[in-house]
Amino acid sequence: LLASTGDQALAAWLGRLQDASFSRAGAVRKAYPPERRMTGPQLAGYLARRTYALASSTRPDGRPHAAPTLFSIYAEAFWLPTLGSAARLGNVRAHPWLALSIIEGEHDTHAAVLTEGPAEVLAAVPADVRSITELRNRGGSLDWATDWLRMTPQRLFSFAELAWQGVSPSS
């Protein structure tokens, strides 16, 4: 459940997922040094605050596709409400994999979470997913969401510049 920074279960899961991802990573470990990675609680807080991600998928013909999307986290998966005519539905049906990029800031204050995993198209979702996502949509109705994507992350990486973390470079 994506509720607040205080959600210890979410923070623990995100921390474990990131640790496992970095333990299997190659060159990305150099690009994302340990002191620049978010902690589990930082990840939970960041993802609670950021309501939109850039979803990247592969079109049936192999070309890349990216589009912004509202997202929620529930039951260790990312949930994306989607219009029935959205290109990403056909993309995920053809290539059941999705990558999400959640970024903010510029230069010394930027932060990013990158996650990816298998995805599936669903016509219905648990009531909790719908209500959580409506809250994240500032109470806006999700009647337009005729389909949903559920992505179960296999990898998650984060990066946060020191200024984003509130740390001075000399500390």
Where do the protein language model's features map onto the residues?
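Charged, gly/pro-rich active-site loop segments
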Residues: 1-38, 108-171
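Short, conserved active-site entrance elements at the starts or edges of catalytic domains
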Residues: 26-59
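Short gly/pro-enriched beta-turn/loop segments at secondary-structure junctions
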Residues: 48-50, 64-66, 144-146, 152
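Short beta-strand segments
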Residues: 50-84, 100-102, 111-114
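Short acidic (Asp/Glu) patches
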Residues: 84-86, 96-101, 129-140
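Short, surface-exposed beta-strand-loop junctions and turns on beta-sheet-rich folds
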Residues: 86-88, 165-166
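Short, charged beta-turn/beta-strand-edge "cap" motif at the junction between a beta-strand
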Residues: 104-106
